[in-house]
């Protein structure tokens, strides 16, 4: 519909009617085009969904073709059909893209640009037309006797009429252009869409026409395939009947004699089979899983598609033993540095086979995997016997002070070579024996069991400062003086690095299990004259000698009774008990007193590892216990007091109570007590080697254990040594006091931290119905009170979170991280002050 420009100038009723008709037509065509665009969008979206689904279908056909690789007929057929269908899908995609461009985008552009511009011009035209009507009314209403108003109304009417005519001409022009463009846009878009449809079907026909000969050939092959399938079915039915008849007479009992393992299997799988595994949850459920030993690892999976779960990452760091103390039969346990795994076989023969397979794999891993291959794995979790914590890396760096663990431990006398075979550069250690070992000897030690030797790597495991210092206090030379004292007399020859594994294993078992080379104690009931121990001052290996001063520690030349020397330790500890407490402001921080503690290290310090500091001059002067042993020293004034309290040998009642027999004639348990009290690690190691029970309670001394004596002696390192050798941290004396009670009574913060770390029960009550916290509060020891309260808070948080773990032991909950760091910082602090 075209609007005449002349009618526009006249603004006649015909013009207005035409304008209204055109506007109505534009509104209707806009609605129709919007609907068509939406329908086209829906069609395109549905087409894209169809294309996406078709592509998935084609992908499924290709997967089926890959699955049928063994059958060339099916594989080739599916592959060709998948290629053809993929082309058809591509043609569909082209069709829908063309529909989107030709219909949706083109018509939508016409509606949004041209129709919108028409609407905006219409709004301006309507507004000007209203202004013209208003100007005409005002001009008609202007009074004759007011020329000023008449002139103003006339001028406004003239301007409004000019504006109306100008805008009306533009509006009519836009209407005519829109009417012409509407026809072109609609026809052009539909023509393009139909061309796309034509191209789609032509391409599809051409594609399928080329495939038609192959489809006819395949149809002929299918006819023959039906015949062949019928023949094959009859043959399979005949075989099925024959096999079913034969199995009726077969015995299905399982032949356990066929169970075997092969360490050198080409596939790398030493042994595999089903085992029951006890879960680590609170219910301890048992689940059947498929286990295998491969690549020096113990792994399992539930289904073939499941990823392998690694139980033991490195078999060199684990051990295996049968378990007879649980209710279920045929069980065995695999112990790794981080956890233990309880497994159950289906029979005794299978259990033996699995145990032997694990042991053989461990030996094979030692032979085939040198220690250097794993040297980069320095941050492995420590073994359970040492209760390693998450902050072990930080504390290790603090304890080593720039040296590596390997260099520091190897610098001890005798540690430059293996303590059993003499091979240079040993990188493994037995932490409860205090010796360094080569990789082959460490494997033999591991086979002895953790009750005999606890093996740890100097490069693969993390080392707590207290354990590192313990290793530096002993060493191969000191330990071999005990375990190889009568080596030459026994007629045995110590193996060398080139000796066979059998020779090394026999030697190690004779040395540590049979203990054939220990110096035997004389069998005489008593000596004619009582022997005494000479107590003299000596320096620790790592201290530097300095000239003595008037107030320095002096050499005690008089021969003191052994008991006087030992009992003086407790006297000195009581004398130098720390009296500094937290200030109220310091309680706001767990570590605020560290600097004050380090700055205040002075004469009140007693021993190098007691947690009470070191000597004022930086040296670690000690008293010799027996021959070449290490105990703490006393000042000149304290030595006099000790001599005065002990008295002469003939009249000293305390010495008579302890006995004046030679150390070699002491009961091993009593020797362990005295050595622990005197902080003499070599003597304590000798006592344990001679059969001393680590938890032996001395009935004549209120049932105290060696661990309690170590607390009274004030040595954190001796406590660590006893704990590594199986000391019970919760065993009480006749007064109901555990080691934690005694450490709290004496204000030994470092030992309190060590016992809390090792799972000491802080709720235990003594005969006076006091727990360690009550004792610490009564003694006004702010640091121990703070530690015990933090321990209780951590325990309560662990119980609230239902974290697994034995009562009193430190669990791995993140809520305890700060407390565990605090514990380790305390221990590290007291070790560094020495």
From Swiss-Prot:
What is the purpose of this protein? GTPase-activating protein for the ADP ribosylation factor family.
Keyword Zinc on entry? yes
The UniProt entry, under Gene3D superfamilies, shows: Ankyrin repeat-containing domain (1.25.40.20), Arf GTPase activating protein (1.10.220.150), Arfaptin homology (AH) domain/BAR domain (1.20.1270.60), Pleckstrin-homology domain (PH domain)/Phosphotyrosine-binding domain (PTB) (2.30.29.30)
Lineage of origin:
Eukaryota, Metazoa, Chordata, Craniata, Vertebrata
InterPro entries, per the entry: ACAP1/2/3-like (IPR045258), ACAP3_BAR (IPR042695), AH/BAR_dom_sf (IPR027267), Ankyrin_rpt (IPR002110), Ankyrin_rpt-contain_sf (IPR036770), ARFGAP/RecO (IPR037278), ArfGAP_dom (IPR001164), ArfGAP_dom_sf (IPR038508)
**Polar residues: which segments have biased composition?**
382-392
This one is known as: Arf-GAP with coiled-coil, ANK repeat and PH domain-containing protein 3
Ranges of compositional bias, category Acidic residues: 634-653
Note the Pfam families from the entry: Ank_2, ArfGap, BAR_3, PH
Zinc finger (C4-type) residue numbers: 418-441
- What cellular component terms from Gene Ontology apply here? cytoplasm; growth cone
Q: Which residues form the PH domain?
A: 268-363
Q: Which GO terms describe its molecular function?
A: GTPase activator activity; zinc ion binding
Q: What Gene Ontology biological process does one annotation of this record name?
A: neuron migration
Report each ANK repeat as a residue range: 702-731, 735-764, 768-797
- Renumbered to this chain, region (Disordered) spans 375-400, 633-653
Q: Which CDD domains match?
A: ArfGap_ACAP3, BAR_ACAP3, PH_ACAP
Q: Which residues form the Arf-GAP domain?
A: 403-525
**Which UniProt keywords are present, listed alphabetically?**
ANK repeat, GTPase activation, Metal-binding, Repeat, Zinc, Zinc-finger
